[in-house]
């Protein structure tokens, strides 16, 4: 039974990934900021997959001690981590001229440094799993904002570009150690983050919610929102034995937006 640690697991893409792994019989460590949200997700998983092994840990992604404590609790509850899914993130928008140092640091800390901290915590387990011939995996949920630029989210885009750079560099370091490292880059996805972005557009521009949603959908050549389950299936493939030679890649799930 694989032990999969998923951050930002209480909702959206993280919740979809958790359900996909639960259906494959994995043991799950689910981390997030809100215990109530994690508990609700646990109930959903229990209903869908009775008997699934789940450990919940409340974690502040930007606090090194909190991340270490969460990892240690996960390890104690379910054993060494075989797969790490760095999904937790945050997207705040602001024109660059109004992007102060607080916002800049927040975007880098949550989206990039948090990913670094989780990898550092779980890496000994992952290296051990790789040495044993297990399918040890790190998958970082980045964004199309890690592949291209978007106006008004310079700090977020800088952080996600950093995640892509980290993914590629670490993939080379671990290539001969049985651990693959890849990134998945969703376009605008039907999640709370996008719903918050729509609300922000409405507030700042006076557009209706439908107009704001249409503006985001327009980025996708297929003219649709990505669904969390689509992202989850990409993650599942990357974590499968079939993807053993896929390493250091940034896979866009965006209907062709970032070609």
Named regions from a protein language model:
Residues 10-11:
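Conserved glycine-rich cofactor-binding loop
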Residues 95-96, 103-108, 216:
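Substrate-binding pocket helix/loop in short-chain dehydrogenase/reductase
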Residues 119, 159, 167:
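Active-site helix of classical SDR
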Residues 124, 172-173, 244:
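Alpha-helical segment proximal to the catalytic Tyr-Lys
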Residues 143:
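Residue(s) in the substrate-gating loop at a strand-loop-helix junction
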Residues 175, 180, 246-248:
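Short, small/polar-rich loop/turn modules that mediate ligand/substrate recognition or access, typified
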Residues 222-253, 258:
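C-terminal substrate-recognition "lid" of short-chain dehydrogenase/reductases
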């Amino acid at each position: 039974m694989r032990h999969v640690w998923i951050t930002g697991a209480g909702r959206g893409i993280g919740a979809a990934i958790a359900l996909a792994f639960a259906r494959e019989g994995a043991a799950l460590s689910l981390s997030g900021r809100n215990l109530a949200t994690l508990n609700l997700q646990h109930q959903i998983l229990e209903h869908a997959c009775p008997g699934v092994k789940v450990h919940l840990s409340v974690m502040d992604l930007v606090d090194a001690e909190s991340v270490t404590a969460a990892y240690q609790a996960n390890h104690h509850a379910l054993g060494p981590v075989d797969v790490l899914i760095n999904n937790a993130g945050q997207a705040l928008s602001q024109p660059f001229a109004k992007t102060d140092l607080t916002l800049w640091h927040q975007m880098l800390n949550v989206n990039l440094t948090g990913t670094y901290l989780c990898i550092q915590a779980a890496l000994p387990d992952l290296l051990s799993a790789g040495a044993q011939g297990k399918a040890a995996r790190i998958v970082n949920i980045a964004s199309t904002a890690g592949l291209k630029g978007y106006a008004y989210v310079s700090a977020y885009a800088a952080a996600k570009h950093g995640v892509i750079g980290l993914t590629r560099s670490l993939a080379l370091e671990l290539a001969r150690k049985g651990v693959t490292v890849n990134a998945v880059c969703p376009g605008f996805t039907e999640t709370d983050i996008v719903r918050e972005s729509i609300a922000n557009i409405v507030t700042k521009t006076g557009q209706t919610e439908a107009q704001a949603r249409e503006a985001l959908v327009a980025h996708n050549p297929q003219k649709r929102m990505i669904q969390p389950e689509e992202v989850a299936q990409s993650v599942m493939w990357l974590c499968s034995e079939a993807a053993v030679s896929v390493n250091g890649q940034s896979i866009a799930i965006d209907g062709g937006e970032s070609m």
